[in-house]
Amino acid sequence: MSSVLTDLLNLDLSDVTEKVIAEYIWIGGSGMDMRSKARSLSGPVSSVKELPKWNYDGSSTGQAQGHDSEVILYPQAIFRDPFRRGKHILVICDAYSPNGTAIPSNKRAAAAKIFNEKAVSDEETWYGLEQEYTLLQKDVKWPLGWPIGGYPGPQGPYYCGVGADKAWGRDIVDAHYKACLYSGINISGINGEVMPGQWEFQVGPSVGISAADELWCARFIMERITEKAGVVLSFDPKPIEGDWNGAGCHTNYSTKSMRKEGGFEVIKKAIEKLKLRHKEHISAYGEGNERRLTGRHETADMNTFSWGVANRGASVRVGRDTEKEGKGYFEDRRPASNMDPYIVTSMIAETTILWKP
């Protein structure tokens, strides 16, 4: 990139204008593709309520017909923009038809209804989302660092590995980590995964629907960073067939009752509810998850529900600290890396708090 272009991209506008750039972000028709466009605001904003609604051509995103293509964006969450910096912002939006009804691909609206239920809000649901992903070489769609058409050595040395022959893509990972912290996303950590070229970042603990807003924004930031790096970001739950780990989005969850004394009994009752609705959850936990949930590579078989303490081959894992202290949280290990966090987080809350067997 030329120095002139770099200088222009890094221009500090604060001395010449009060205007602020807002990048409006939404989810496209596939349910995983992220879209965005920017607009100028007259000045800084302190609340999402100050932001105007906007619209876009839904016929170009698979979300509307050409003869009636306008879809309306409702701003829902604000984050600092790590690319433009200054007072510029990223805005997570959801999408509605002109008559005010949520379009079918808008999963946030239904999630918000669940999280706004008094029984749910009173429980102050906490989520920690472990987003696994794979970095691919742009032109061949093969994992970063792998020989083209070939394979690296067997799994073993790559998980949390260090070294040029074990960890590929660390600059991207660290850039993303810092960008999320700058943005105000509650990112809590990163690590290299079992399959080389695969990494993980964690968001949370965050309360209610904010966990999903933060994960979608973190995904957007990663998409932008990999775009800049010339690398393809994949959320495929099983990007490479064979003796290689898949990619999930393990979802850690607790309620106020679970975090109190005697909470372990509440956890066990919640897990029993999840068992009774196992099929419904599996069907909503990500496309292609059957390629990942095979009972191998630290997964449970998708057709069987199981849970255990410290068991990473179970559907639901309870940590040893939770068992020892008699309170805490549990981890739902079933969601795939391409899951929609609005669906998964709200469904877990609905099943464990609202649903009556």
Swiss-Prot record:
Keywords: ATP-binding, Cytoplasm, Ligase, Nucleotide-binding. Residues 107-357 form the GS catalytic domain. Its EC number is 6.3.1.2. It catalyses: L-glutamate + NH4(+) + ATP = L-glutamine + ADP + phosphate + H(+). One of its GO terms (biological process) is glutamine biosynthetic process. It is found in: Cytoplasm. InterPro entries: Gln_synt_N (IPR008147), Gln_synt_N_sf (IPR036651), Gln_synth/guanido_kin_cat_dom (IPR014746), Gln_synth_cat_dom (IPR008146), Gln_synth_gly_rich_site (IPR027303), Gln_synth_N_conserv_site (IPR027302), Glutamine_Synthetase (IPR050292). Pfam families: Gln-synt_C, Gln-synt_N. Residues 20-100 form the GS beta-grasp domain. Belongs to the glutamine synthetase family. Homooctamer. This is Glutamine synthetase cytosolic isozyme.
